[in-house]
Amino acid sequence: MEFTTAMLGASLISTTSTQSKHNLVNNCCCSSSTSESSMPASCACTKCGCKTCKC
């Protein structure tokens, strides 16, 4: 029983970590630069209508 509880706890921690990382991607700020080559691939610019963004 203790083993199952430990696994469940580890699973919850993993899910929380992934969620916060996802939020960081969604919260990328628009960049004043127009150079698309400087845009990090992890930024979700399409979600905020930006051509370029900075994290």
Curated annotation (Swiss-Prot):
Keywords: Copper, Metal-binding, Metal-thiolate cluster. The keyword Transcription does not apply. Signal peptide: none annotated. InterPro entries: Metalthion_11. GO terms for biological process: cellular detoxification. GO terms for molecular function: copper ion binding. It comes from the Eukaryota. Belongs to the metallothionein superfamily. Type 11 family. This is Metallothionein-3. It comes from Yarrowia lipolytica (strain CLIB 122 / E 150) (Yeast). The gene is MTP3.
